[in-house]
């Protein structure tokens, strides 16, 4: 089975992101706006309980995370993905790193962690240039504290569903 680990921002901020995703993201219907902490990984059913136990421990030892969304950016030329960029911070990076150690699969989809919330992807290059130009003119300033993260499971239709939620309860 395929799994992923994410954090969801508040519903009002998801609504803001979805305003763009509806138009510019082909994956809009598959998953709400989120911060990916661990890209898709596969584990056997018998390994799942070990992973869940590790996630509970991580939740108990990590504090809630303040996020600061401060601009629109793009991964161009690697891809035409456009996203809300989140300022890196020690707590977010520590949580990300904890999810890339044993017992989790260590493979990283990208060499560098860029905290973000995708608002557009899979755009043709010509359309990307126009859209990113417009979106970069928008003043973006959003702060919130997120006190939980989710283990998602990929369903047969390609969409993602929350399998379990873990509170960030560290001291």
From Swiss-Prot:
Active-site annotation: 34, 116
Q: Does the keyword Ribosomal protein apply?
A: no
What the record says about family reads: Belongs to the 2H phosphoesterase superfamily. YjcG family.
Q: Where is this motif: HXTX 1?
A: 34-37
Protein's name according to its UniProt entry: Putative phosphoesterase ABC1741
- Annotated InterPro entries: 2H_phosphoesterase_YjcG-like, Cyclic_Pdiesterase, YjcG
| Superkingdom, taxonomy of origin | Bacteria
Pfam families, A to Z = 2_5_RNA_ligase2
Which organism does this sequence originate in?
Shouchella clausii (strain KSM-K16)
What is the top EC class of this enzyme, as a single word?
Answer: hydrolase
What GO terms are given for molecular function?
Answer: hydrolase activity, acting on ester bonds
Alphabetic keyword roster: Hydrolase
EC numbers: 3.1.-.-
The sequence motif named HXTX 2 is recorded at 116-119
